[in-house]
Amino acid sequence: MNIKLSFISIAFLSLSFNVAANEFEKSQEHYKSVTDLKNKIEILELEKKITELSGEIRNARMPKIDKSAPVLSPQPVVKSSEELQKSIEHIEEELKVELAYLVNNGQQKKYTFNLNGKLITLVNGDFVNGWKFIEDQNKIQFSKGNKVIDVN
């Protein structure tokens, strides 16, 4: 009788060990899947932050556009050709150009200028407001007709 009881208790113990081992394996699989899901969530959150930051950077680079309609006067304003010539000369005299930075990739030089308060990027031969950008060795100039502006 003792042998039967010991045999039954040994069988019961081995069965309970097998069940415990199976439960342990299942819990390990669940732990691994939970850890993988946590890692995926962290990756998605980081990707979301990256896209938000790149959007903020893109918005900061883009100039703000005033979408309000310009106010038009009901009567057209007629100016004489002398007044127009004076205003054109006045505009040309106020062309203020400063070199912000230069990017040289070995094939092409791209110059970024602060032009009347706005940043623009130009390469040799580009036109801006009727002015041609000329880069000749170490000289940087804007020319329009017989007028030349040297950039220091």
From Swiss-Prot:
Membrane-spanning intervals of the chain: none
InterPro entries cross-referenced by the UniProt entry: Toxin-coreg_pilus_synth_TcpS
S-S bonds: none
Gene Ontology terms: cellular component: extracellular region; periplasmic space
Intracellular or extracellular location(s): Periplasm; Secreted
Signal sequence, start to end: 1-20
Main location: periplasm
Keywords, comma-separated and alphabetical: Periplasm, Secreted, Signal
Pfam families: TcpS (PF17456)
Function: The toxin coregulated pilus (TCP) is essential for successful colonization of the small intestine.
Protein name: Toxin coregulated pilus biosynthesis protein S
Organism encoding this protein: Vibrio cholerae serotype O1 (strain ATCC 39315 / El Tor Inaba N16961)
